[in-house]
Curated annotation (Swiss-Prot):
The keyword Hydrolase does not apply. This is Small ribosomal subunit protein bS16. Keywords: Ribonucleoprotein, Ribosomal protein. It comes from Lysinibacillus sphaericus (strain C3-41). PANTHER family: 30S RIBOSOMAL PROTEIN S16 (PTHR12919), SMALL RIBOSOMAL SUBUNIT PROTEIN BS16M (PTHR12919:SF20). One of its GO terms (molecular function) is structural constituent of ribosome. InterPro entries: Ribosomal_bS16, Ribosomal_bS16_CS, Ribosomal_bS16_dom_sf. It comes from the Bacteria. GO terms for cellular component: cytoplasm; small ribosomal subunit. The gene is rpsP.
């Protein structure tokens, strides 16, 4: 099963709010999810990002592929750097 870490859109029309979720790559954008990893609110200034770092690193280590936007959010939070250090230090 191909697993992705991606954004699931929530919120009302014209006011998006996203959950960062782990989902099967074949499921629809707002469909079934395996686990919620965090949240992202682009409307606040600056944008609010809350990520459970342990869950994110666990799923990355298990082979989940982040979407481009999630990869950028993880990089801003320093999670991708920790993952690469963890992966290549072995």
């Amino acid at each position: 099963m191909a697993v992705k870490i991606r954004l699931k859109r929530m919120g009302a029309k014209k006011s998006p709010f996203y959950r960062i979720v782990v989902a099967d790559a074949r499921s629809p954008r707002d469909g079934r999810q395996i686990e919620t990893v965090g949240t992202y609110n682009p409307l606040t200034q600056p944008a609010t990002v809350n990520i459970d770092e342990e869950k994110a690193l666990k799923w990355l280590a298990d082979g989940a592929k982040p979407s481009d936007t999630v990869r950028n959010l993880f990089s801003e939070q320093g999670i991708m750097e920790k993952f690469h250090n963890q992966k290549f230090s072995k």
